[in-house]
A protein has these predicted regions:
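Charged, glycine-rich active-site and insertion segments that engage polyanionic ligands
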Residues: 1-54, 58-138
Length: 138
């Protein structure tokens, strides 16, 4: 029971952190983005990778929800988040974000500087969402 509570608590923390990040990217701008990057940089590599996996999971759910609609069996919070993600990003953008998150996770495993990585990721996500740009990588 305690492990389940810890998991739910961690998920709520991740969701709050993700909401903060997306708001910084889309609404509040550079000062909030820098503050958020400072915050995630303090978490350590494993937590950073967990956060990226969590965001990836939500993006995959959003894509499934877009395709399956009400038939998809997900929780109320996840459904709400999926609907919001689907409003701000199309499938191509969501897939591009998933690829960027996977790449970031890979770089974290290889000792990338957390601050630089999350600053760059923030800028990439801004352009993917706002400008509907998908980065093509070899």
């Amino acid at each position: 029971h305690e492990a389940l509570q810890l998991m739910q608590h961690a998920e709520e923390d991740w969701q709050a952190l993700l909401r903060e990040w997306l708001n910084a990217i889309l609404k509040t701008g550079p000062v909030a983005q820098t503050k958020w990057v400072e915050e995630i940089s303090r978490l350590g590599r494993e937590k950073q990778k967990q956060f990226l996996r969590y965001f990836n999971h939500l993006l995959e759910q959003a894509i499934h929800y877009r395709i399956m609609g009400e038939k998809l069996n997900i929780g109320e919070k996840e459904r709400d988040f999926a609907e919001r993600l689907n409003k701000i990003a199309g499938i191509e953008q969501q897939q591009a974000i998933i690829e960027e998150l996977d790449r970031a996770s890979y770089y974290i495993e290889r000792n990338a500087n957390g601050k630089m990585l999350f600053h760059a990721l923030t800028i990439k996500l801004y352009h993917i969402i706002q400008d509907k740009i998908v980065f093509l990588v070899d």
